[in-house]
Amino acid sequence: LRSRGLGDVYKRQQVADIKIESNIFVPKYMNIDYGDMGVLFGNLLDNAIEANQGVDRKKRWINVSVKYEEHILIINIKNSKIRGSRRKKKGYLNHGIGLNSVKQIVEKFNGIVEVQDFGEMYEVSAILYGICDDKDLGKSVL
């Protein structure tokens, strides 16, 4: 279970020389715990950075898209990877717990997580339902 700050993820991305593009359109306030958001994005971005490790430095990239539409939060992260690779962390007893943590958080909002391997690209999509924005906080939206 990773709950490191996104600043740590940013530092890892810089050291790994990965180009990141992001399109993030969300309200300032939402009914998602900050700790859950840290675990959600920390794990997804850590996985994307890890998948880039074997890729030629000039071909490393991550694309992050997050948008909010009518009580739905849509997260999409795509990243480069080596075709056919399925990295395993040597000596890491809890490998795989990160994505399970992501799924648990998404399930709190009756959402879904989908992971797809397109050869030289991974894509992870998560949809969370019943998200309140700053105009709706305190109201039931389900």
Could you describe each region identified by the protein language model?
Residues 13-21:
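Short conserved segments within the C-terminal catalytic ATPase subdomain
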Residues 1-10:
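Single conserved hydrophobic/aromatic residue that forms the stacking wall/gate
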Residues 59-71:
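Short beta-strand/loop element within the Bergerat-fold HATPase_c
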Residues 71-100, 135-141:
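Glycine-rich/acidic phosphate-handling loop/turn and adjacent ATP-lid/helix
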Residues 34-57:
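Conserved ATP-binding N-box helix of the HATPase_c
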Residues 104-142:
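Flexible, glycine-/charge-rich segments associated with ATP-binding catalytic modules
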Residues 22-28, 68-70, 79-81, 117:
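Heptad-repeat coiled-coil segments of the DHp/HisKA dimerization-phosphoacceptor module
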Residues 21-40:
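Conserved short strand/loop->alpha-helix "switch" segment adjacent to the catalytic nucleotide/phosphoryl-transfer site
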